[in-house]
Amino acid sequence: MKIFDIIPLKSIVIVSLAFVFLGIPGEAKAQSTNGVTLHLDSKQQSMVTIASLTAKGDLENLEAALNGGLDAGLTINEIKEVMVHLYAYCGFPRSLRGLRTFIKVLDERKAKGIEDNPGAEASPIVDTRPKYDRGKENLETLVQRKLDGPKADYAQFAPVIEVFLKEHLFADIFERDVLNYQQRELVTVSVLTTIGDVEPMLRSHMNICLIQGFTPGQLEKLLQVLEKNVDESKIKSAREVLNELIQSKD
């Protein structure tokens, strides 16, 4: 069952209005129907595919996806940043193998006389506040609410993991402006869907996608892109998570 089989029109309208008022840039606005964005552009789809194949360790198909992403206009640094970002969700081994595959692809393209755009480097971090405070603020920006309540059970049980999440993931990684928050969340949802069996985290990041301006239709499109390379059972589970999330907002 796909999302538009169950989502009331009201839900789509609400999300669409949120999209407008948040002032999301044009890169997130591909094709639309009655003002509701239903698709992802070619760069976004390439990011989804590259992230998924890297997380899966499907290096043969990753080579083709990397070529496709570069041809679609992704810069070298944007693709590198996708692979740096996803290690936080699927581990260093997958990320490093993906980066080595990317090196191979770039060498082959260079040998063919193809000059790819390196793109922008990450801007220097000038905020001198403690990384924990910066990471907490970045996370609050992502979820659009204050996070001053009781800590989650895992944070109480193993406090250091919560410190790592704030200081490393949401400060060290999310502060890097090679990718914006939308792109990072798109990559995150792609990876979580691909690895499977992490439904609570997948729901949280799908919700952040909606908060950051993606529409239900765009998240459905993400799942359609992933259907080409991800097990049917994982896509079904992710679609159920998305449908339940949308229903909970009515």
Q: Where are each of the predicted segments found?
A:
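Bacterial N-terminal signal peptides that target proteins for export
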Residues: M1-I14
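Bacterial N-terminal signal peptides
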Residues: I12-I24
